[in-house]
């Protein structure tokens, strides 16, 4: 029995995703730049193809103003070089006019034939700082407009920021049906939780103790119930898996062995979400960790010394990592977004040791969003007018 009701209650499978380091976030030793691991198209697309080969069902393509890849351009480039893996595109609300964003995402969904998922984010733009309440109001309105564009014939919207009247939705019809691409969302403020509970599909969390994660899940679930909704829940976490726990712990220590604290701080500060509430919670993890950086027997916070955002890793043997994932699943977590350093090597480590022992799924398929044949949309099987 899960601790909260989840949308995919009937399935025992879990969506296991990897991470493509689009934002200058790949290292053999944290904080030590390696030009062979820069966020080039060649390197990042190889991570995607490797994840597909290893059986991962989705891959997060993040967004930030770093030397690297633009998210939506990168996802478009991945369409012809992949065939099975879903792509989870991080979209910072407000960067694009909402109706045009709906059309852009619909185009990508057609290119991927239903393999697009969307991570809604609300962080600041480069060189521009705005009030949190405004940013989440903007995201709330963008999400509502996306859902109108993907499910209705006409877009009519009157919000505090955006107003549209009688705009045809034909150009924005996606490949996926019954609601369009799934919306994944992470955030910790009351405005963020309210937005996710009312409009999104998967609530994403960064690593904390299981007790705190359970509290967060319950808080969001209560809000969703007020709208007669359920959600699925996801965990974004790094992972280090080896044959033995000792090997995994030794690798974790080696990963940060050349890290200068000043360099780590500068890496954290350059992220667009560096001052967010979620990042503050990750910093708190490091404050309460034991002398080796662990807040639970297999949850290590050392990664957060040189990374904004998700700042902890599961560390252990194959059996220990499997046990940790199973315990999260029993809580009600149905999506894992994993990563490790360097991303290509750790993708293969996890894939070869763990993936074959997991029952995995694609959440868009579980939700019935992906049609068996080309849908009757203006851009697919529908008649041209």
Language-model features: locations:
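Alpha-helix-loop-beta-strand connector modules within alpha/beta enzyme cores
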Residues: 69-89, 148-149, 225-227, 233, ...
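Glycine-rich, proline-tolerant flexible connector loops at the mouths of alpha/beta enzymes
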Residues: 58-77, 207-211, 338-351
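Hydrophobic faces of well-ordered beta-strands that scaffold small-molecule active sites
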Residues: 14-20, 59-61, 86-91, 116-120, ...
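N-terminal beta1-alpha1-beta2 module of alpha/beta enzyme domains
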Residues: 1-82, 176-181
